[in-house]
Amino acid sequence: MSRIMIQGTASSVGKSILVAALCRIFKQDGFSVCPYKSQNMSLNSYITLDGKEMGRAQVLQAYAAGLEPEVYMNPILLKPTTDKSCQVIVKGEVYGVSSAKNYYNMKKEFAPMLKEDFEELEDKFDIVVIEGAGSPAEINLRENDIVNMGLAELVDAPVVLVGDIDKGGVFASLFGTVMLLEENERKRIKGTIINKFRGDVEILKPGLSMLEERINIPCFGVVPYFNLSLEDEDGAVYFNTKVNSKIDVAVIKLPHISNFTDIDALKIEEDVSLRYITSSENFGTPDLLIIPGSKNTIGDLLYIRKNGIENKIKQYAEKNGLIFGICGGYQMLGRLIEDPFKVETELGEINGMGLLDIRTVFAEKKVTTRVQGSVIDKQIPVYGYEIHMGISSYGEKAKPFIKIENKVGIDDGAVNEGGNIMGTYIHGIFDGANFREYIINFLRDKKGIERKKSVVYEDVRNGEIDRLADIVRNSLDMNSIYSVMGIEGKK
C-alpha cells in the first residue's frame, strides 16, 4: 500500500478539500483509495450505516473515493463542548468528556490503536491519503502528536505541505513551518502546494524559486481560488446573496452551532438565498427561519435570549412566520429543557421558547442512528441521521412531524397547531430532494412563485467533486506526487 499525507501551515488552508481531490484523482486513475484522518476536531459529524459517529470532512473524502463512509477513516473525533473541554469519540462511540489538558496527556494512549488500525488498511487499498490537522509547527503540541508529524512517523508517510496564499504571507508561513520542524521531520516533506491563488501564476515564479532554494523542497503546483457547492467543515459556511433570489432563508448563527452542513443542500436551489442572523438587528423578515443544531443547547438558548434574538423569533412566530428547528434548535423551541445529569450545564432545567408543546430531558447516553421515514399525512420521503442526548415528549398542543419507518412505533419531531412551527432530530433532512422540494415549494406557493423540481443533491455533489479533481489535476505535478508514493502513474 502507498500513502501520502497532506499537512498545512495552518487550519483552513485547504487540506480537507485537497485530500478529497486526490482521492477522486487516484480513483479516476484506477486505484482503490481511502481517506484517513487520525484525529479530527469538529462540531460537524455524521452517522455511518452501523450507527457510528465520524467527522464530516472524511465523509466527503469517502464519497470522492467512491466509498461508503466508515469510522476507520476518522478513528478519533473531538467535539468541543466549551472553550476548554470536548467530547472525545473513539471509533465512533463516546469515550468521555475531557479537558484540553487531560486530552493532551491522553493522546499517547491512542497511538498503538492508530498504528494497528492503519496497518489493517494495507490489505484493503492501493493508496491511503492522510490529512493532518492545523499545523505541524505547533511545537507546543509536538509531544505525543498523533495527527501531524507524529502520525507521519508512526505510519512512515511522505508529506506534502500546503499553504494558503489568499490569506497573505504564504512564503513566510511555508518557510517558517519547515524551519520549526526537526531535521528528520523536514526530510519527510517532499513537496509544497500553494492553494487559493488569484491571478497570473507567472507573478509567483520568482517567489517560488527563492522558496525552493531556501528550504530545498520543490513546489508541486499552485491551485487557483475557486468556488464549489461542497460542504466546508472547518467553519460555518459563508453565504453569497443571489441577485435574482426570491426566497429568503435565514439561519440563526449560534455560538456552538453544530452540523451546519444540514443547510448546505439549500444552496443549490436557484431562487433561494441563505443568510445568517447574528443579532436582533439583522433578523429581517425571512420566508423561512432555521434554528440549527447546537453542541451546547442550553448555553446557546441563553445567548439568543440575552441578545434579543429570542424575542424576534417569537414576534416572527406570532406573524405566522415559518420556523424550522433541527436537533438543538428543535429542543429550544419547546416548553422546557431538563438536564438532570448535568450533561451540558449545572442548571437543572431551563424554560424553552414555548413555541412547540414539547418537553426535553437530556439523557446520559447519546442516540446515534440513521433514519428514514415520511412526513406524517404527506407521504413525503425523509432520510438522515440522529445525533442527540435529549429525549422529547409531546404535550397536548403538539403533534408528531415525521413517521420513522426503520424504528417501529417511533415518531420524530413536532408541529404546532398552526402548522408554521416544526422541529426534528434528523440531521441532513434537506439533502433529500423530495423533502427540500416540499418545503421550498410551500414557500413558493406562499409568495406566488412558480413551483420547481429540486435536483438530487448527491448528483450535484458528485459533479462538483469531479470538477474539483479536474482543477487540482491541472494545477499539480501529478507525476511528482505519484513518484513520492513510489508509483509510476496511472494503472
Swiss-Prot record:
CDD domains named in the record: CobQ_N (cd05389), GATase1_CobQ (cd01750)
UniProt-listed InterPro entries: Class_I_gatase-like, CobQ/CobB/MinD/ParA_Nub-bd_dom, CobQ_GATase1, CobQ_N, CobQ_synth, GATase_3, P-loop_NTPase
Catalytic residues as annotated in Swiss-Prot or TrEMBL: 327, 427
Domain annotation GATase cobBQ-type: ranges: 246-435
Pathway annotation: Cofactor biosynthesis; adenosylcobalamin biosynthesis
Keyword Cytoplasm among record annotations: no
Keywords: Cobalamin biosynthesis, Glutamine amidotransferase
Top-rank taxon, per record: Bacteria
GO biological process: cobalamin biosynthetic process
Gene Ontology molecular-function annotations: ABC-type vitamin B12 transporter activity; catalytic activity
Protein family (similarity comment): Belongs to the CobB/CobQ family. CobQ subfamily.
Record's function text: Catalyzes amidations at positions B, D, E, and G on adenosylcobyrinic A,C-diamide. NH(2) groups are provided by glutamine, and one molecule of ATP is hydrogenolyzed for each amidation.
Name of the protein this chain belongs to: Cobyric acid synthase
Source organism: Clostridium acetobutylicum (strain ATCC 824 / DSM 792 / JCM 1419 / IAM 19013 / LMG 5710 / NBRC 13948 / NRRL B-527 / VKM B-1787 / 2291 / W)
